[in-house]
A protein has these predicted regions:
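Hydrophobic core segments of alpha-helical transmembrane domains in multi-pass membrane transport
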Residues: 7-10, 36, 40, 76-87, ...
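Transmembrane alpha-helical segments in multi-pass inner-membrane proteins
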Residues: 14, 129, 139-204
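Membrane-interface helix caps of multi-pass small-molecule transporters
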Residues: 12-23, 42-45, 86, 90, ...
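Transmembrane helix-bundle core of multi-pass membrane transporters
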Residues: 24, 28-91, 117-120, 139-148, ...
Length: 222
């Protein structure tokens, strides 16, 4: 039940963000940043800034369980990759997502319901973010108000390294997977080398800047 509630509210928050972004002129970055801070504030109030232990076997199974000797998280990751790739590459909705990302005005003139597409993207993002949160809690056996801090930077770095254009309209699931692997190797490598966490943030920021600059050059400097 706790898993379903967590995923439900995550999807609901994503849907709310999508509703605000699609119905107003407020930049998506501002809306999601505000929602993130509201969520963290609610988490602090609810937990009283304390760490909550999660020891229920049915819950932790999704974080630490195995099927045929492989982590259940691996199966879920593969399922998300397949579903997301299918939506983007094999459906009309996927083509509309690329079109809206590339040029919202042109998409509107071509008859695409930009508001519905935007709403879906944010709701689906909320669903995936909440699913990741549930799996993280199941893996660490704890829930804290700071869980997920800086995860947004990991996500930005991964998608940019994977070839997603910051100007929109370009990107792929396979490229993002490669970006995630690269960021994972980079972070694990720095941990193994004993690099201070503060410097790890510096390195990650530099990587993002380089990736964005390369994207800027590839797009013709526009």
């Amino acid at each position: 039940v706790g898993i379903l509630i967590g995923v439900f509210f995550g999807t609901l928050i994503g849907a709310f963000n999508g509703l605000v972004v699609s119905r107003t002129t407020i930049p998506a970055f501002i809306v999601t940043l505000a929602a993130m801070n509201i969520g963290r504030g609610i988490a602090r109030i609810y937990t009283h800034a304390q760490t909550i232990a999660v020891l229920d076997d049915a819950y932790t199974f999704w974080g630490m369980g195995e099927i045929l000797g492989l982590p259940i998280q691996l199966y879920l990751i593969i399922a998300v990759i397949i579903v997301s790739s299918f939506i983007l590459n094999r459906t009309k909705l996927g083509r509309h997502i690329y079109a809206v990302g590339g040029n919202k005005t042109a998409a509107e003139y071509s008859g695409i319901n930009v508001k519905k597409v935007t709403f879906f993207v944010f709701a689906f993002s909320g669903f995936l973010a909440s699913l990741a949160g549930v799996l993280t809690v199941g893996r660490t056996f704890t829930a804290t108000m700071i869980m997920g801090d800086s995860a947004e930077m990991d996500a930005i770095a991964a998608v940019v390294l994977g070839g997603t254009s910051m100007s929109g309209g370009k990107g792929s699931i396979s490229g993002t997977v490669i970006g995630v692997i690269v960021i994972g190797i980079l972070k694990n490598g720095m941990n193994l080398l004993g690099i201070d966490s503060s410097w790890q943030y510096v390195v990650q920021g530099i990587v993002i800047l380089i990736a964005v600059y390369i994207d800027f050059i590839k797009s013709g400097g526009t």
